[in-house]
Amino acid sequence: MLERERELRLLNELKQAEIAQAVTRGLNPNVPMKECQTPMLGKIPVHWEERKMKYCFSERSEKNHPDEPILCATQSQGVIPQSMYANRVVVVNKGFDGLKLVKVGDFVISLRSFEGGIEYAYYQGIISAAYTILTPIDPSQSEYFKLLFKSYPFIQLLQTCVTGIREGQNINYSLLGRKYIPIPPSSEQKEIVTYINDKFAKVNSLITELEEEIAYLKEYKQRLIADAVTGKMKVC
């Protein structure tokens, strides 16, 4: 099992390194580079635009939609219905009216974004009022933003914008919104997204298989321990 976990970790590291390279430096290694106005993101192609985040998104704060399904923000699956994510139980203390509305295509900054990036909403529903909901002003850029917001350099940027000392930390969007992010030309955004999706289609399949195998091995190990403790299995 340890070997499988090592393989999984290596695959994820290689994937993330490739994504970080593509979303910040592009696909052409020969183009001239410039320093991004947000130093954490390193160098970007000279012809790429830079724009403050607050000019790329509007903030959604709609509430009072109690009939919408409750959503949760996951680092592996994006923003999905709570019913689809069995490993997490969301406790609502103040009723559904106080939860924020999320629409398909929004991006959600959660209390875990400082660890895993900003999540994309694949479903409409309602979510914790503590989260920041961002709607892209130009939806055609969403596919590129999905990659940028989950990249290591951007997560490092998020970690400079946190507030709070509890286990989950808020991202200060008034601070994050003033940070510059790279905006490649539309044609290059499409090329980057296609390149990453095509290159990692097989890798993603291998990652899923490894995750399932590791989960099975852990469950099998727990069953063996339980059988030994309860006397169902003889231990020599």
Please provide the spans of the model-predicted regions:
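Amphipathic alpha-helical coiled-coil/heptad-repeat segments
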Residues: 1-31, 183-236
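Non-catalytic DNA-recognition/assembly elements of restriction-modification systems
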Residues: 36-65, 182, 186, 190
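DNA target-recognition patches
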Residues: 54-93
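Short, surface-exposed loop/turn microsegments at beta-strand edges and helix-strand junctions
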Residues: 62, 66-76, 101, 118-129, ...
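Short, surface-exposed secondary-structure edge patches
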Residues: 96-100
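Structural motif
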Residues: 103-106
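A short glycine-rich beta-alpha junction/loop motif
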Residues: 111-112, 125-132, 165-190
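Short, charged beta-turn/beta-strand-edge "cap" motif at the junction between a beta-strand
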Residues: 113-117
